[in-house]
Amino acid sequence: MNKAPLYGDVVSEFYDLLYPPTDVSHVVEYVRSRYPSGARIVDFGVGTGRTAIPLAIAGNHVHGIDISERMIEALRDKDPERGVTTEVGDFTHAVGDGTYDMCMIMNNTFFMILGHEERTQTLRAAYSFLKPGGRLVLETYAAHHYLRESSPITSITPLGAGDLLLLDKIDVDPIKQQLLALRSIVGRGNVATFVEISRFSLPQELDVLGRAAGFDIAERSRNWQGDPVDAAALSHVSEYVRR
C-alpha cells in the first residue's frame, strides 16, 4: 500500500509564500516582553523556521520539531549557522525534560491535529517540555466565523512577486467543526494542488483541553500585539501557563 505523502513534504516548496513572515517582528517582541533575557523555546511543527529563526537570532534558544523531513531541510538551508536545533519527529509523542520556558504551536498547526486523543497527547508533550510556570502558546484562526457557514468559500490571492496565484476552495462542515481546503498554486508554467484539513475548536473548548492537561489560560488576544479579542478577530493567540 502506498503511504500518503506528508502535508509538510507537499507544501515545503511553497510554505514561505503561503505564510510570509509579515508578523515575525511582533512574535519576537511578544517573547521578549515575557523573557527579556531570552527564553528556551520548543516549537511544535516548526516548518521552515518562519518564526523560529528570527527568535533564535533575537537571542532565544529554539528547538524545532517537525514530522516533515523536507520542512526541516528547508529550515536548515535558511539557517546555515544552526541557530535553531531541530529534529524530525512526531511532536504529539515527544517527551521533554521540563527545562523550557515556552512551547509554541503556530499558524493553525493545533487545528490540523484532527483527533481528540492526539490533541490531548500534544498538550501532554508540551507539558513535559515546560518548567512549572512555563507558557504554552497556540496561534489559531478564529473558529466562530465558520459555525454558520454552509456554502463553499472561494478566494484568489497573489503570492510572492505576483507571478503566482493561490486559488482556494474551502468546504465547511459546522457539525464536525471541520474545514477542507483545496488549494492550488498557479504560475511559472505549473500548477500545484494540495489539500489542507483542519478541525476547529472554540476558545472555551481549547481551555477545557488545556485544563485537563495541566494548563490554565493566562490571556487571549487577536494578534501578537495583544489587541483584545472581538467578533471581528480573524485569529487568536492563546497563552496558557503550566501548573
Predicted regions and their residues:
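Conserved class I S-adenosyl-L-methionine
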Residues: M1-G47
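A short acidic, Gly/Pro-enriched loop at the edge of an enzyme's catalytic core
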Residues: H93-M102
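Class I SAM-dependent methyltransferase SAM/SAH-binding core
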Residues: G49-H93
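C-terminal lobe and adjacent flexible extensions of AdoMet/dcAdoMet transferase-like proteins
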Residues: P203-R243
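A short glycine-rich, Lys/Arg-flanked "PGG" loop and its adjoining helix->strand segment in the class I
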Residues: T120-P132
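A short SAM/SAH-binding and catalytic strip from SAM-dependent methyltransferases
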Residues: D101-E117
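SAM-dependent methyltransferase
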Residues: V137-V208
